[in-house]
Structure formats: C-alpha cells, structure tokens
Amino acid sequence: MADIVFGFGTSHSPLLSTPPNKWHLRVEADKKNPSLEYRGKSYVFDELVKLRAKESLDYQSSLPVRAERHDASQLSIVKLSEHLEKVDPDVLIIIGNDQREVFEENNTPAISMIYGENVNHLSIPPERLANMPPGIAIAAKGCSAEQDISYPIDSDLSTHIISSLTKDHFDLCAMKSLPDGPRGPRGMSHAYGFIYRRIMKKPIPAVHVCLNTFYQPNQPTASRCVALGKAIGRAVNNYNRNLRVAVCGSGGLSHFVIDEEFDQRVNQGLKTLDMNLLASLPEEYFISGTSEIKNWITTAAIVNEGGLKNSMLDYIPCYRSEAGTGNAMGFMTW
C-alpha cells in the first residue's frame, strides 16, 4: 500500500526570486491597483497607508529589513529542498493553482488534474521577458524553465485519485495534457514551476492537482478544500502500489496585502492540523493571492490522513511598501 511520508508548504512569491533592492519595482503597480484586497474589502494604496499607519510598515519595508527577511526566506527554501531530498519520495503530489497561465475565462475548472505521462515546463522567450511589467521579468527565473523540458507524471496514481475522487462526489476536470494556447502547447503554471526550480534537486514523478483559488464564481471553499484533501488522502492510503508519497502545497500566505493576524490563525490550524478551524476560515479573506492558502489547507488535510505531525514552521512577512503590500512567506513541514 502507498504511504504518505512527508508534507510541506511553501510560498512561491516573485519576491523570493527578486533581490530586495528591487522590490520597489512592484510598488508602482501597487499604487495603480484600484482593488488592493485586505480583510474582505478593497482599497487603493493611499487608503491602506492611512488605515495601517500605526503598524510601522515604513520600517518593515525598509531595505535592511527587506534584505534580512529575503535572506531568511532563502534559508527556509534550502531547508525544504534538503528535507525533500532526504525523504526521497517515490511520488510528489503538488497542490497548486493557475493564474490564467493555462486556463482562460471561457473555461476555468474548480478542480483539475493531469493523468498523462508527462507535463511540460517551458522557458520564457526573450521577447516576452522584454515586454513584461517592471519587476516581473526579474522574478520569472524562479518559476520558469531555463530551457523547455518535460517532467514525469505518475499517470497510474493520478488516474486512481481521479477515479476515487469521482466516487467521493468530486466532479473534476481530467486532462491527458494541458490545453494548447495561442502560441502552441502550454507549460505548467508558476505554482508548480517554482517547486521544480527551487525545491526539487532531481525530478520526482508527480501528481498535479490544480485548484481555482483566484477566480469567481467557482472557487472551492475552505471547507471543500478540507474535504478534498481528506478524499485525496484516503485515495493514496487505498492505493495498491508500495509507494512513499510526499505532498506539497504551493503558494500563499497572505498577499498582495499582508495580514499577519489572519496568517497566524491559518498557521495555528495548519500546525495543529485542526480541520474544523481551517474549514471555518472566512471566505471573504480568500481573495487575490491570499486565496492560495487553500492549497495549503488541502495539503494539511492530506497529511492528516497520513497521520503526520508538524515539524517546521517559518513565517516571514516580506513588506515592500508602507501600505502593507508584499507577500507573507510561509514554509512548513509535516
């Protein structure tokens, strides 16, 4: 039988691949954003500066603090990579999401999985890099491939999980391969690319589970993510091959406006594997990048089915402006 032997969560923010003295390049975009989401409401930049004036965010977004937290985040990534290498699983289940890299508005499945033999990880052509907004091209190296490459999918386990989820009343999109786009074949979303570029030291056969965390109207709720994770965990436990299975949640924590108070509630649920707490988190907080926490919630429910316990939690809020914009980084193992 298959065994769930290791789980981890990691942020995949562009800031993790951007030198701290370049974080300001995205602040101009923050200032132009008419809908900075914070605690269930939308703000403009100056409104957040006023609202959060007592939090010393000008200091927290200063270059020395940015550099310190960037360095701490890099150490956490190294720890995750070394831990995964030491565990050396046969398969890695990656719970991620898409931000219009694969799915477009005319077809956005709530839950999708690949069951083919491989998945593409594509490089970004120089002409596309040149046309990217300030700060994005710098960070692209953290998620995109240096050159086009294909990685193995555990097709048999993926098919088993899809069939098992269907019996558990989950209606999901099953793909032999990712859909083609206007430029031809598409590659994996950056939520997955980060794991291959920054965490894996060697290719590991994988299972890709994609959640629509970002886009209305069909995002799975937190409680549905708990149920999904439990169902995936049961499917793995009932699989009749002797496999050592690891699980990863990619994304989060709160961004693009950091909310440390909410993150601490989330982290408490993740650390203690309190499924009731995680399932009851308010949906209005899961907007924009913060919605990627649902990838972690699903992962936590899977590892809970495997009987694992929390062994590491690094929480590093990386502010880039006095409005509280940036990304709260999280790195966790079970």
Please give the residue ranges for each predicted region.
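Flexible, D/E/H-enriched segments
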Residues: M1-V87, S112-K230, A235-N238, I258-W334
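Basic polyanion-binding and macromolecular-assembly surfaces
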Residues: L243-V245, F256, G289
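Short catalytic/ligand-binding loop motif for oxyanion handling, primarily in non-cytosolic enzymes
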Residues: L15-T18, R100-E105, S254-I258
